[in-house]
Swiss-Prot record:
Family statement drawn from the similarity comment of this UniProt entry: Belongs to the type II topoisomerase GyrA/ParC subunit family.
Single biological process term from Gene Ontology: DNA topological change
Pfam families reported in the protein's UniProt record: DNA_gyraseA_C (PF03989), DNA_topoisoIV (PF00521)
Residue ranges the record marks as coiled coil: none
Top-rank lineage group of the source organism: Bacteria
Name of the protein in its database record: DNA gyrase subunit A
Gene: gyrA
MF term (GO), any: DNA binding
Length: 839
């Protein structure tokens, strides 16, 4: 026991005499963690605000520079660059260095490439670069501008990790790389995320800052529009852009560039540019996942047609889906649209600092001033040293005989140098230069060259001294340098900035506001077609096939409206349903369309009898008329909250159905026509307004087997158009029709014969509209009413459309020429001048 105790005492004595100290564990953890955190912040994760580079990026570029891998030299194996960098400057894993170098060679990662890569350096699909032994690389031409004049003492150098090499603490950076290429990184307790910008815009911003140091953030926003990402895409201008310009923090909304193309059988969404840092393969997988989960149901097929020419992702749209609405769903559910968080944190004088746009530009500008001053000082010293030597050489040349004699008499160089100093006042440097001078330099020609060089050096010395003394001249030189960079490397924006678009996407934000024709068949198939799809034909023309129908189906409704209009569907059961016009999928003249039951909750035995487009529910009335002549007037405001599930619009007797609904102003004359060729005319205000659920009053007195065939107003025209079932029609002035009371028999307007057939349409027009007629076979003929001459009452009219045997006229629609051509805007009238009348 005593022996063991002696050993313990001995160990305690040795420990007491050693350098081991007793310290607090919590204090040591705090100190060590702070050292680690600062190491990560300063030496790994955050870029320097001056050159925009992290240490590993700087070391890769400088390693390639010292290895002679310039842009005008042959490519070298990537493994050679990685090996040089790892052995001299960055003693970490080779894959970390290679990944860094590869990223600087990827045009989808960096806005302005710093490495010119040769071989497979990865793809936007997430493919990794080929092994470094297979790929080759060199500095890009633009990277040379980052390193320009680095050999002129423009930046500080420090010893590398083993003290055998010197590496720069920052690069001269002749262009603002921090903002041009951006940066991202996660440190301890902080992170940075800086978007790339357009180099030309940045240089314009720097020139603005030089010319006007007091410029505001708004001034900078005038020239630097916002981020400009390597992959292009669209940027939605939001307050987030203004925020990071002002504070250094914000969000940028990036939206894929997508067009809608019409394939032979269906529409397709074609994606040609995707947001920055979005993996294309992962994007496709996410879309497929959503389709399988039935979260998105409008996609028929998706395929990747990308090539060397660029991205092309084709998403085929199902026929019953509106492409714009599907695109909106994809923007909301996938990375076709992303938010890029901006946190402009960078190292300023070795410490992390959050910079706004002006501060970032100012830090770079100060760095350029420092680089210019140091380069000028370096050049000045070099010029002065050379000037000093030339002065000695010229003294010797002018006294060459005496100089030669002194040299010949001298025992050695030291004696000769002392003699030259005593005789001509030459210092050691000048005397040594004289001794090193070759005999051929003594010729008159060479002496003249020395004198010329001395004069040039004198001018350069004076210029350098002027630069060092004049800050405005320094700024002027920087402007000239930036202008040259812009001329050589400036390029157009890749990312288009969209103004006036809400960040919160609504379906209609993506739908073009334009005039369309909405058609519906007897069996309830709806279709949306562009107005220009129909050919204007001369009176009596045969027409074009307007709609392919099933064997027992034919066209019953047609309406011209805006894609942003409300569509109100009035049914023969007296109900009304509402959707937006763009919810009807676009189609072709020859396809069948989409069943109305897919869009509105209509009963199987319910038939749509009127379509009306509305944008404003504040003014006007709906005027109803049933097939048996019952009428009702109701304010538009009572229909403002109609849904697709429908509401009651009118009540009527059990043996009746709703024939038509029109819009009125409250001051119109109402015209109601019958199949027997009679028309009744009365003042609208003789019918008092009733609620939606009310039953109306009689408007026309009909005989048995007679039905209403037309409902229109005096504000819709000064002529009355009457068209028979066999395509015979005519125009008559409404002045020929006297006012009557409602529920009158009316006056004769068209003489009904076997040639005319029953009257299918009676409506008011101005006479300068276009007339669209649809036959039972689906033919559409479009003529101008200006081709028809005015006729008297009770005449038969002229042929308007050629019909085959057993073919009859089903639908007649009137619309204004101008509004059928131009795109409807939000400020235009609700109805686009359209009137539809059905038998």
């Amino acid at each position: 026991m005593a022996k063991q105790q002696d050993q313990i005492d001995k160990i305690r004595q040795e420990l007491a005499q050693s350098a081991i100290k007793n310290i607090s564990l919590s204090s040591e953890l705090e100190r060590s963690f702070m050292e680690y955190a600062m190491s990560v912040i300063v030496a790994r994760a955050l870029p320097d605000a001056r050159d925009g580079l992290k240490p590993v990026h700087r070391r890769v570029l400088y390693g390639a520079y010292t290895g002679g891998m310039h842009h005008d030299r042959p490519f070298k194996k990537s493994a050679r660059i990685v090996g040089d960098v790892m052995s001299k400057f960055h003693p970490h894993g080779d894959m970390a260095i290679y990944d860094t170098m590869s990223r600087m060679a990827q045009d989808f990662s960096l806005r302005y490439l710093l490495i010119d890569g040769h071989g497979n350096f990865g793809s936007i699909d997430g493919d990794r670069p080929a092994a470094q032994r297979y790929t080759e690389a060199r500095l890009s031409k633009l990277a040379g501008e980052l390193l320009r004049d680095i050999d002129k003492d423009t930046v500080d150098f420090v010893a590398n990790y083993d003290g055998e090499e010197q590496e720069p603490t920052v690069l001269p950076a002749a262009f603002p790389n921090l903002l041009a290429n951006g940066s991202s990184g996660i440190a301890v307790g902080m992170s940075t995320s800086i978007p790339s910008h357009n180099l030309s815009e940045l240089i314009q911003g720097l020139i603005l800052l030089i010319d006007n140091p007091d410029c505001t953030i708004n001034d900078l926003l005038g020239v630097i529009k916002g981020p400009d990402f390597p992959t292009g895409a669209n940027i939605i201008y939001t307050k987030g852009i203004e925020s990071y310009f002002e504070t250094g923090k914000g969000n940028v909304v990036i939206r894929s560039k997508v067009s809608i193309e019409q394939l032979p059988t269906r529409a397709a969404l074609v994606v040609t540019e995707i947001p920055y840092m979005v993996n294309k393969t992962s994007l496709i997988e996410k879309i497929v996942e959503l389709v399988k989960a039935e979260e998105i149901t409008g996609i028929a097929d998706i395929r990747d047609e990308s090539s060397r020419e660029g991205i092309r992702l084709v998403i085929e749209v199902k026929r019953d889906t509106v492409p714009e609405v599907l695109l909106n769903q994809l923007f909301k559910s996938t990375r076709l649209q992303v938010r890029f968080p901006v946190n402009m944190l960078a190292l300023v004088k070795g410490a992390p600092k959050l910079l706004n746009m002006k501060q970032a530009l100012t830090v770079y500008l100060e760095h350029q001033l420092d680089v210019l001053i140091r380069k000028t000082q370096f050049n000045l010293k070099k010029y002065q040293e050379r000037f000093h030597i030339l002065s000695g050489l010229l003294i010797a040349a002018l006294n060459i005989d005496e100089v030669i004699a002194i040299i010949k008499k001298s025992a050695n160089n030291q004696v000769a140098m002392e003699a030259l100093h005593e005789r001509f006042g030459l210092d050691e440097i000048q005397a040594r230069a004289v001794l090193d001078m070759r005999l051929r330099s003594l010729s008159v020609l060479e002496v003249n060259k020395l004198q010329t060089e001395q004069q040039e050096l004198k001018a350069l010395i004076e210029f350098c001294q002027q630069v060092l003394a004049d800050k405005q001249l320094q700024l002027k030189l920087i402007k000239e340098q930036l202008t040259k960079i812009n001329e050589q490397f400036g390029d157009p924006r890749r990312s288009e900035i969209l103004y006036g678009i809400s960040e919160d996407i609504d379906d209609e934000d993506l739908i073009t506001q334009e005039n369309v024709v909405i058609t519906m068949s007897t069996n309830g198939y709806l279709k949306r077609i562009g107005v220009d799809a129909y050919n204007l034909q001369h009176r009596g023309g045969v027409g074009v096939k307007g709609l392919t129908t099933y064997t027992d189906d034919s066209i019953s409704q047609l309406l011209v409206c805006s894609t942003h209009s409300d569509l109100l569907f009035f049914t023969d059961k007296g109900k009304v349903y509402r959707i937006r016009a763009h919810q009807i999928p676009p189609g072709f003249r020859t396809n069948k369309g989409i069943p109305a039951v897919n869009l509105i909750k209509i009963d199987k035995d319910e038939k749509i009898c009127a379509l009306i487009s509305v944008n404003d529910y504040q003014n006007g009335y709906f005027f109803f008329c049933t097939k048996n002549g019952t009428i009702k007037r109701t304010s538009l405001s009572e229909f403002a909250n109609i849904l697709s599930i429908g509401k009651r619009a009118i009540l009527f007797k059990e043996n009746d159905v709703l024939f038509s609904v029109i819009r009125t102003s409250g001051q119109d004359d109402i015209f109601i026509g019958s199949t027997a060729g009679f028309v009744v005319r009365f003042h609208e205000d003789t019918v008092r307004p009733l609620s939606r659920a009310a039953m109306g009053v009689l408007g026309i007195n009909l005989n048995q087997c007679e039905f209403v065939n037309g409902l229109s107003t005096s504000s819709n025209g000064s002529l009355l158009l009457s068209v028979g079932q066999n395509g015979i029609g005519k125009l008559t002035s409404i002045d020929k029709y006297r006012l009557t009371k409602r529920n009158a028999k009316g006056v004769k307007t068209l003489r009904v014969t076997a040639k005319t057939g029953p009257v299918v349409t009676t409506t008011t027009v101005f006479g300068n509209e276009d007339l669209l007629m649809i036959s039972s076979a689906g033919k559409i003929v479009r003529i101008s009413l200006e081709q028809l001459s005015e006729q008297r009452k009770n005449t038969s009219g002229v042929k308007l459309i050629k019909l085959k045997e057993k073919e009859r006229l089903e639908t007649v629609t009137i619309f204004k020429k101008e509004e059928a051509i131009k795109t409807t805007t939000a400020t235009e009238t609700d109805d686009v001048g359209s009137k539809q009348i059905t038998q």
